[in-house]
Amino acid sequence: MTGSNMSNALANAVCQRCQARFAPAERIVNSNGELYHEHCFVCAQCFRPFPEGLFYEFEGRKYCEHDFQMLFAPCCGSCGEFIIGRVIKAMNNNWHPGCFRCELCDVELADLGFVKNAGRHLCRPCHNREKAKGLGKYICQRCHLVIDEQPLMFKNDAYHPDHFSCTHCGKELTAEARELKGELYCLPCHDKMGVPICGACRRPIEGRVVNALGKQWHVEHFVCAKCEKPFLGHRHYEKKGLAYCETHYNQLFGDVCYTCSHVIEGDVVSALNKAWCVHCFSCSTCNSRLTLKNKFVEFDMKPVCKRCYEKFPLELKKRLKKLSELAARRAQPKSSGLHPA
């Protein structure tokens, strides 16, 4: 277009907003082929010039950034800021793509997809883990699906057994597979190697072996049946196929002192069908220390030293003597009553 033709075109042109013509020397704003007086090129909402010439167009009308956000831009459900550009609509809310993340592992979900789980938006691996946790099952660390049957444990992680083959024979593995030096073997191949199996975890023992209770154990897995603390070479006590530390063996199976009611550790004084700690066995009247070498008398099912007994009233001593003789006769074996002819 020549200069004269352009001048003629501008002389006939009108402002897009006010529809008035332009003065010959007037500055004109051209926005995508639309012409405006400079003072007419303003926000359709606040009627102010666009800061730095930046505007947003919606349904043929132009808005400054602030008014466009207030009128049309959704707020992000995570950061609360207005969203300009791509909007993720999910969980009855709007999100920036970078703000829509898995609520457990924080991975971005915009391009991965998500699964709704108990009101939460989760990535699929986290959803599978939560689902498995609710069912009391494991998640396979290779395919990230729930393991419905028995898992194969490898390097402390759970897997579907059919993801692996025996290192020696190449057969597909089952949950009975064994790990040895970082490799997996089927049970027959593993047994041929003669490696001891821990009686607790059922896994191979590659280091020190504890032989006890007719089984073999990892050192850290041979523990007290009560407190579950490893013995680590300390003495253990066996009862009905189980091992106990000294403290809990005494608590469960040891003698309890008649006086202090504590489990007796060390020597036991047995008398009057009861048990005492050595330092607790004393006269029930004067509390003087007794031993089995001392003479004592039973009174009210308790020991009384000879000195205190001598102070008892005469009638009481006679009654005690009679009771003692009666108890002695009852303790003697009865004769059959038959006599030879």
Curated annotation (Swiss-Prot):
Cell location: Cell junction, Focal adhesion; Cell membrane
GO cellular component: cell-cell junction; cytoplasm; focal adhesion; plasma membrane
Record bears the keyword Membrane: yes
Protein's membrane topology: Peripheral membrane protein
Any GO molecular function: metal ion binding
Residue ranges occupied by any LIM zinc-binding domain in the UniProt entry: 13-74, 76-133, 138-195, 196-255, 256-315
SUPFAM superfamilies attached to this UniProt entry: Glucocorticoid receptor-like (DNA-binding domain)
A Pfam family per the record: LIM
Main location group: other
Keywords: Cell junction, Cell membrane, LIM domain, Membrane, Metal-binding, Repeat, Zinc
Gene Ontology terms: biological process: cell-cell adhesion; cell-cell junction organization; positive regulation of integrin-mediated signaling pathway; positive regulation of substrate adhesion-dependent cell spreading
Function: Adapter protein in a cytoplasmic complex linking beta-integrins to the actin cytoskeleton, bridges the complex to cell surface receptor tyrosine kinases and growth factor receptors.
Subunit structure: Interacts with integrin-linked protein kinase 1 (ILK) via the first LIM domain, and in competition with LIMS1. Part of the heterotrimeric IPP complex composed of integrin-linked kinase (ILK), LIMS1 or LIMS2, and PARVA. Interacts with TGFB1I1.
Stated name of the protein: LIM and senescent cell antigen-like-containing domain protein 2
Protein's gene: LIMS2
